[in-house]
């Protein structure tokens, strides 16, 4: 089989490595991929949002199955376009990807169908948003409606911070069109849990839970990032909570999308907060999370391609989705200065042992064929072990085998989860 994977980050590298465990997969093409995954896939310099070229490539190369991993091409209709040429795909069509593409849509969906989430108001003009903030409870959460590279959510601790966030989105247009509408919602407290799930639009099969580490600095300080590391499973996510989420959140979401004529297939990511009043949805993503994928997929014991095809064929109910009962930890190595500004082009070296456990994100091959840094988050190194403590220790040991100038990592990935276990 010839498989096409759209995207070029660590998440895509993890998906590709897992797909290649299936003996029937002969070639995986990554569009655009990156220099660090060139040994695992044929990287083709076509951008992830260049849908016309992606479709042309898929047709010319007689692709048997496509996986569209990032949010942008999904929201832009990459699956619709590939399906239109008879190519089966993993991922939702554009009318379902809106569940991530528009925060206003997803909040209104939850309200309409009684899915637990934070109280909220939607604003289309800055003046009414600022007026509302004069009396709104603080802290509060300001969200840009559209996609904003994971940076479109501001937790404002003061009224002034909230007002500045609204102005930057609606007047300064820091997120462009994505900030034309905004959501202002109540600040929830409690442990956060990421649950990715496979769905064919009828059945939901959750993957193992995980815990992300969003802030750039140790002890959850500094700016929000795309994620500096993850552990799985998440110790806060008990079997009782899992049952409650399936009954009150996971299935109702899929049923709500069906009722709206927006059947969702692929990977639906539930960002949850376990509040004193029960689990609530903070966000939906219409795709695998990054770096959650780098701990979740290594623990998947079932064949990934088989499960993906079941979401496409509507046969997920009778397809086994089994996970290991071990623990995983992924440590991200980033460029110093991320997520603001950082230098690129530093050579990356990896020991053979580290390389086998590392997913490459922000890297490319230079003119001489040497792997150099090209982004904020450069690599993610994952270890699996019987206990969480061992997985964390091993992930850091393996991560020591990845080096480049001005590399930065958090030193406390998984420590919050360890405290929860004690």
Where are these regions (language model features)?
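ATP-binding N-terminal substructure of ATP-dependent carboxylate-amine bond-forming enzymes
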Residues: 1-94
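Short acidic-hydrophobic, aromatic-tinged amphipathic segments that line or gate anion-handling sites
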Residues: 43-49, 121-125, 156
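Internal nucleotide-binding/catalytic subdomain
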Residues: 152, 156-293
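Active-site "cap" helix and flanking loop/linker of ATP-utilizing ligase/carboxylase catalytic domains
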Residues: 246-268, 285-353, 366
């Amino acid at each position: 089989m010839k498989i096409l994977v759209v995207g070029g980050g660590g998440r895509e590298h993890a998906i590709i490595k897992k797909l290649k465990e299936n003996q029937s997969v002969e070639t995986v093409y990554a569009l655009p991929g990156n220099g660090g995954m060139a040994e695992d896939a044929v990287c083709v310099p076509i951008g992830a949002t260049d849908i016309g070229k992606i479709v042309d490539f898929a047709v010319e190369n007689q692709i048997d199955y496509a996986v569209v991993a990032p949010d942008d091409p999904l929201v832009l209709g990459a699956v619709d376009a590939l399906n239109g040429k008879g190519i089966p795909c993993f991922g939702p069509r554009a009318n379902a990807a809106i569940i991530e593409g528009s925060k206003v849509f997803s909040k209104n969906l939850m309200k309409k169908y009684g899915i637990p989430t934070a109280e909220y108001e939607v604003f289309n003009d800055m003046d009414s948003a600022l007026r509302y903030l004069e009396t709104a409870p603080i802290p509060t959460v300001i969200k840009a409606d559209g996609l904003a590279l994971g940076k479109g959510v501001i937790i404002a601790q003061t009224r002034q911070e909230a007002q500045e966030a609204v102005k930057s989105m609606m007047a300064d247009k820091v997120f462009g069109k994505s900030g034309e509408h905004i959501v202002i919602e109540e600040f929830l407290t409690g442990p956060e849990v990421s649950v990715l799930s496979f769905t064919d639009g009828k059945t939901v099969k959750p993957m193992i839970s995980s815990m992300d580490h969003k802030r750039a600095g140790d002890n959850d300080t500094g700016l929000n990032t795309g994620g500096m590391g993850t552990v799985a499973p998440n110790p806060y996510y008990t079997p009782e909570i899992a049952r409650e989420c399936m009954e009150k959140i996971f299935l109702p979401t899929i049923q709500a999308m069906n009722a709206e004529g927006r059947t969702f297939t692929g990977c639906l990511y539930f960002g949850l907060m376990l509040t004193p009043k029960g689990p609530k949805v903070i966000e939906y993503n219409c795709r695998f999370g990054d770096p959650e994928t780098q701990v979740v997929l290594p623990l998947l014991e079932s064949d990934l391609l088989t499960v993906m095809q079941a979401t496409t064929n509507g046969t997920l109910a009778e397809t086994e989705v089994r996970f290991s009962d071990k623990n995983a930890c992924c440590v991200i190595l980033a460029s110093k200065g991320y997520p603001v500004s950082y230098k690129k082009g530093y050579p990356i070296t990896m020991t053979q042992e580290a390389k086998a456990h590392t997913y490459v994100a922000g890297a490319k091959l230079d003119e001489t064929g040497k792997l150099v840094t090209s982004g904020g988050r450069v690599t993610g190194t994952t270890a699996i072990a019987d206990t969480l403590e061992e997985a964390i220790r091993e992930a850091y040991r393996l991560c020591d085998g990845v080096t480049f100038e001005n590399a930065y990592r958090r030193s406390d990935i998984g420590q919050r989860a360890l405290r929860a276990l004690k």
